[in-house]
């Protein structure tokens, strides 16, 4: 399936099937945040115009008219789901983002990449060594973005490298906290070089990436080893290359939200979630409490927590670019009463350690 190409189709020549979509967005008057308005959905021609505007906004291109027709049909189906969800007036809303021309199965195959089948966690040892075990009180809210410990949102693209982005975000955070320097680091080095247990664009695990950084003597800066959205040959480190080091890593006790907040109050964390839900694909804003399982398939970073209108949440940094969610972030509801947390966020959190 070709989702982009250098050539652009100049005209939408097929006689597209007119579909009657009775759509409205009842829960918000600011339609700009979801990417469509009722006027866009009043006629077949306006629906096509909406699709063309979306193509331009996200710089999409299709190799054939047939492919464009197929993507339009998927787009309409996704739009129907988005609008039906928004009409329910939930605490979050969905929008027409970069993934609006992908079926849900295509999306999961292309953008999720955590490999939990290679997990090795010693739960008793994890709790015994947990650095923040004896912390008694934490602030009501923490946002590491405001403390300058979170780099700009990045985009993994269609490479299943979420594990590398999750790892890097946590290392960038602790490095800023300890040294005062926010240094943007290389996910590509992990993809190309951390191959003992991790599998590049075919998934991996954050704990193994932390181990690689320790054994390798650090991780290079992004500018010295830029992201290419594909697996490459590991580039040997040059003597003049600057690296950021860590001393080790620790796991947060499993299914323990209090412990997760204790750690998160002190530094950004690598966390794993179940991001396979269709509502997660199109999340655009608000405190998310939608349907999702606990089968971990996506690595992200927890960078804070807080409350809004009585809803407690965890601030999660994703790696799907700044046009997804709230400028690349999602607020996941916490205090759900389930030990594993919403989308399994309490199941497998970890963090790097650094003393100097």
Curated annotation (Swiss-Prot):
Ranges that cross the membrane: none
Purpose of the protein: Cysteine protease involved in xylem tracheary element (TE) autolysis during xylogenesis in roots. Participates in micro autolysis within the intact central vacuole before mega autolysis is initiated by tonoplast implosion. Involved in susceptibility to the bacterial plant pathogen Ralstonia solanacearum.
Enzyme Commission identifier(s): 3.4.22.-
Protein name in the entry: Cysteine protease XCP2
One of the record's GO cellular component terms: plasma membrane
Stored Pfam families: Inhibitor_I29, Peptidase_C1
Broad class of where this protein is predominantly found: other
Keyword annotations: Cell membrane, Disulfide bond, Glycoprotein, Hydrolase, Membrane, Plant defense, Protease, Signal, Thiol protease, Vacuole, Zymogen
Location of the protein in the cell: Vacuole; Cell membrane
Enzyme class: hydrolase
GO molecular function: cysteine-type peptidase activity
Disulfide bridge map: 159-201, 193-234, 292-343
Propiece residues: 27-137
Domain of life of the source: Eukaryota
Organism: Arabidopsis thaliana (Mouse-ear cress)
Family note: Belongs to the peptidase C1 family.
Gene: XCP2
Organs and tissues of expression: Mostly expressed in roots, stems and flowers. Confined to tracheary elements, and specifically to xylem.
Residues annotated as the enzyme's active site: 162, 298, 318
Residues bearing attached sugar chains per UniProt: 181
One GO term of the biological process aspect: defense response to bacterium
Signal peptide: 1-26
SUPFAM superfamilies the record matches: Cysteine proteinases
């Amino acid at each position: 399936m070709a989702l982009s190409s250098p050539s652009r189709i100049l005209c939408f020549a097929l006689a597209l099937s007119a579909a009657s979509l009775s759509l409205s967005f009842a829960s918000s008057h600011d339609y700009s945040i979801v990417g469509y308005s009722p006027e866009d959905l009043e006629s077949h021609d306006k629906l096509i115009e909406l699709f063309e505007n979306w193509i331009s906004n996200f710089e999409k291109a299709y190799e054939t008219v047939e492919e464009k027709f197929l993507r339009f049909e998927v787009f309409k189906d996704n739009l129907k789901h988005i609008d039906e969800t928004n009409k329910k007036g939930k605490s979050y809303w969905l929008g027409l983002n970069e993934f609006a021309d992908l079926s849900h199965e295509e999306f999961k195959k292309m953008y999720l990449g955590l490999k939990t089948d290679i997990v090795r966690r010693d739960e008793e040892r994890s709790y015994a060594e947990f650095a923040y075990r004896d912390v008694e009180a934490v602030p009501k809210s923490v946002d590491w973005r405001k403390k300058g410990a979170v780099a700009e949102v990045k985009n993994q693209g269609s490479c299943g490298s979420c594990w590398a982005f999750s790892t890097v975000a946590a290392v960038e955070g602790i490095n800023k906290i300890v040294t005062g320097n926010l240094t943007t680091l290389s996910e590509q080095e992990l993809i190309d070089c951390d191959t003992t247990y991790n599998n590049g664009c075919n998934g991996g695990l954050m704990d193994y990436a932390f181990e690689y950084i320790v054994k390798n003597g650090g991780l290079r800066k992004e500018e010295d080893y830029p992201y290419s959205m594909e697996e490459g040959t590991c580039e040997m480190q040059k003597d003049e290359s600057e690296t950021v080091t860590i001393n080790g890593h620790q796991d947060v006790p499993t299914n323990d939200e209090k412990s997760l907040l204790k750690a998160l109050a002190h530094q950004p964390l690598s966390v794993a979630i179940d991001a396979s839900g269709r509502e997660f694909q199109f999340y655009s804003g608000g405190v998310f409490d939608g349907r999702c399982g606990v089968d971990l398939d996506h690595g992200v970073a927890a960078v804070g927590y807080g409350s809004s209108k009585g809803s407690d949440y965890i601030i999660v940094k994703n790696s799907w670019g700044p046009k997804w969610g709230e400028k690349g972030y999602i607020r996941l509801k916490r205090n759900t009463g389930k030990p594993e947390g919403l989308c399994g966020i309490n199941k497998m959190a970890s963090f790097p350690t650094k003393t100097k």
